[in-house]
Amino acid sequence: MGLFGMMKFAHTHHLVKRQGLGAPAGYFTPIAVDLWNVMYTLVVKYQRRYPSYDREAITLHCLCRLLKVFTQKSLFPIFVTDRGVNCMEPVVFGAKAILARTTAQCRTDEEASDVDASPPPSPITDSRPSSAFSNMRRRGTSLASGTRGTAGSGAALPSAAPSKPALRLAHLFCIRVLRALGYAYINSGQLEADDACANLYHTNTVAYVYTTDTDLLLMGCDIVLDISACYIPTINCRDILKYFKMSYPQFLALFVRCHTDLHPNNTYASVEDVLRECHWTPPSRSQTRRAIRREHTSSRSTETRPPLPPAAGGTEMRVSWTEILTQQIAGGYEDDEDLPLDPRDVTGGHPGPRSSSSEILTPPELVQVPNAQLLEEHRSYVASRRRHVIHDAPESLDWLPDPMTITELVEHRYIKYVISLIGPKERGPWTLLKRLPIYQDIRDENLARSIVTRHITAPDIADRFLEQLRTQAPPPAFYKDVLAKFWDE
């Protein structure tokens, strides 16, 4: 799942930053957890180590380890799952559903050119399909139809999913234990977990999304890859945009071709393929060295960002991405050495002074950071998140030709669906984005004990896990108090 080749690209080009994610004393950092994505990784790892454990035992073992780390690092998880809290809801929204519905609706590319490109509205869209995307029409065509790469020229019917190793993951048991322990969760219902996580991120509910699924980057989110590491590996969407030197609408329009769930039978393009077609070149070594110096310099004075070249007036046609890259390679644009960076982008953690507490200098247990500095970094981070709301996502459609094939129709529909999830709506003087409801049941340790002992019949194993839950997973705070303190104080 995700963007094909993005994880490898991010590691190769040093876009995976390692952060401490240290919050000020008394604060918890809210984080959305793509539960099945995270649990799958853990179960695959530990079921080999404990071959005698059944599904419930290995699931609870992984869950105990996960909750322990959340507590140690002062992270407040909001758990998100596919198929609702009962694991029975059909998924009717998202990438897979758009592909299935489109391929059932259109059997040939000729039919696709006559079909409405609007997908069904998401659960957070309060408009009907006929009007939900009326403000997302293209103002011009910047890429000629038929200039796409060879990958994805047509869509074949979805094939059977590749076989996976037998997975001892008890989904419903896992959710019931979390609810009994009083953790916050999202009843995503008919949404994919990715889409619900993106909604939580863009409504400034969570600071990060814990997942290894890189399609969250396509939806403009910052993702955490592994919370068990001393310094947590993260990928920030804005770091990728700066590295590519492109806007978010360009990023969404270009790399939708890499989304594996939208392109069956290996018809997706890789990240490297897309960049190669755009004639993109990575920053030179001198640029990289200058960027490293910027990261470790705390005394540098902030300079004024020079204005970008004005767009030609009297036209609604957007400049092509290839033209921008050509000018960049030829030296048509100034190097960004003198452009001030967002402190968050150079420190890899909450913004603040360049000598951030999140830089990798010494092991975290040896780092003593004044709480006043942590508080200053936290406030800068919150202000930065509020400034960088994505308002221009609908411009992604300006970079695409009219859909003439099934693949292009699927991509159009998916982009419009993403816009409906993350793009704020204008309501008079207000800009609003509806958040999915968060639920948090009252903690009931007796219920948790009953669930565990009912499914794990070996008394010694059940008692050991219950003791771990009691000591390592204390009662979580009420989610409204956590969010109010993190975002509003």
From Swiss-Prot:
Pfam families associated with the record: XPG_I (PF00867)
E.C. code: 3.1.27.-
Chief location of this protein within or outside the cell: virion
Effect of residue 192 to Q: No effect on human eIF4H binding
Any one GO BP annotation for this protein: symbiont-mediated suppression of host innate immune response
Domain of life, per lineage: Viruses
Effect of residue 195 to N: No effect on human eIF4H binding
Segments of this protein annotated with the region Disordered: 110-135, 142-161, 285-316, 333-363
Broad class of enzyme this protein falls into: hydrolase
Biased composition (Polar residues): 124-134
Nuclease is among the record's keywords: yes
Function statement: Minor structural protein that acts as an endoribonuclease during lytic infection. Degrades host mRNAs in the cytoplasm by cutting them at preferred sites, including some in regions of translation initiation. Together with inhibition of host splicing by ICP27, contributes to an overall decrease in host protein synthesis. Also, after the onset of viral transcription, accelerates the turnover of viral mRNA, thereby facilitating the sequential expression of different classes of viral genes.
Subunit structure: Interacts with human EIF4H, EIF4A1 and EIF4A2; interaction with eIF4AI and EIF4A2 presumably allows Vhs protein to associate with the eIF4F cap-binding complex.
Protein name: Virion host shutoff protein
Organism: Human herpesvirus 1 (strain KOS) (HHV-1)
Lineage: Viruses, Duplodnaviria, Heunggongvirae, Peploviricota, Herviviricetes
